[in-house]
Swiss-Prot record:
InterPro entries: AmpE, Beta-lactamase_Reg
Role summary: Putative signaling protein in beta-lactamase regulation. AmpE seems not to act as a direct sensor for beta-lactams.
GO CC term (a single one): plasma membrane
Residue intervals annotated with topology Periplasmic: 1-43, 85-194
Protein name as annotated: Protein AmpE
Species name: Escherichia coli (strain K12)
Family annotation (NCBIfam families): PRK10987.1
TM region(s), chain numbering: 44-60, 68-84, 195-211, 268-284
Stretches assigned to the Cytoplasmic side: 61-67, 212-267
């Protein structure tokens, strides 16, 4: 079920998910606007409710019509939670603006892509493009690699854990876009995701190390296994940058393309691993 769902979701996401319509983040915005108080307890409570509703839905559909409705729910939740249709539009808009030397449009789209972690003030063009690469790699992790990890971890209840992670991701993006840094801090969302991302970041990091320059990346990856304080964003992007060391860092079009190309390779490796685990009976 996991492999079948993953393949179909990735195919549908690539063909049809070109905007916000099939994005959980967009569907939850109306609900998030009603939240007036921010705390860690509220963040966890909302997430548990989302997971609980998903669990009850799957439980109610068990055994109905040869589990066809269950399969459809797996696909629907996977399509809502995996992939970043709107972000992909922002990325292509950035490339168009950069190729036309439209500095205003380019800066606007880069701002959308780097919304969560931002770009250091006063950085030069090379540093700016490296941070843009990092943002694209992180988007690939947040919208593809990490959701797939939680879908797998959940086993037969994969959509439940996937929904929980995607809900937290949507909550963080909404807070970053519409609320103050203080409200985001009060919500505790960054701390929760720091914990949840620890394992999937290390798994993604070892893939980056193996497909890139392992002689530099692998020692850094082993060092990260004992690091519980550095942000997961920094851990992942530092490992990825070892693999991107020989790629261009001065071309405003080719630099982000190099990051996206490597992110696609990593996603492909993950799908292959899922297929092998399914073949050998480790996944359902």
């Amino acid at each position: 079920m996991t492999l079948f769902t993953t393949l179909l979701v990735l195919i549908f996401e690539r063909l049809f998910k070109l905007g916000e319509h099939w994005q959980l983040d967009h569907r939850l915005e109306a609900f998030f606007r009603r939240v007036k108080h921010f705390s860690l307890g509220r963040t966890l409570g909302m997430t548990i409710i989302a997971m609980g509703v998903t669990f009850l839905l799957l439980r109610a559909l068990q055994g109905v019509l040869f589990n066809v409705p269950t399969l459809l729910v797996w696909l629907l939740i996977g399509l809502l939670c995996i992939g970043a249709g709107k972000v992909r539009l922002h990325y292509h808009a950035y490339l168009t603006a950069a190729s036309r030397n439209d500095s205003h449009a380019r800066a606007t789209m880069a701002g959308e892509l780097t919304m969560i972690h931002g770009v250091p003030a006063g950085c030069d063009e090379r540093e700016y493009l490296r941070e843009l690469q990092n943002a694209l790699l992180w988007i690939n992790f947040r919208f593809y690699l990490a959701p797939l990890f939680w879908l797998i971890v959940g086993g037969t209840w994969g959509p439940v854990t996937l929904m929980g992670y995607a809900f937290l991701r949507a909550w963080q993006y909404w807070l970053a876009r519409y609320q103050t840094p203080h409200h985001r801090l009060q919500s505790g969302i960054d701390a929760v995701l720091h914990v949840l991302d620890w394992v999937p970041v290390r798994l993604a990091g070892v893939v980056y190390a193996l497909i890139g320059h392992g002689e530099k990346a692998l020692p850094a990856w082993f060092a990260s296994l004992g690091d519980f304080h550095t942000s997961q964003y920094q851990v992942l992007t530092r490992l990825a940058q070892f693999s991107l060391a020989r790629e261009p860092h001065v071309d405003k079009v080719e630099t982000p393309k190099a990051a996206v190309s490597m992110a696609k390779k990593t996603s492909f490796v993950v799908v292959v691993v899922i297929a092998l685990l399914t073949i050998y009976g480790a996944l359902v």
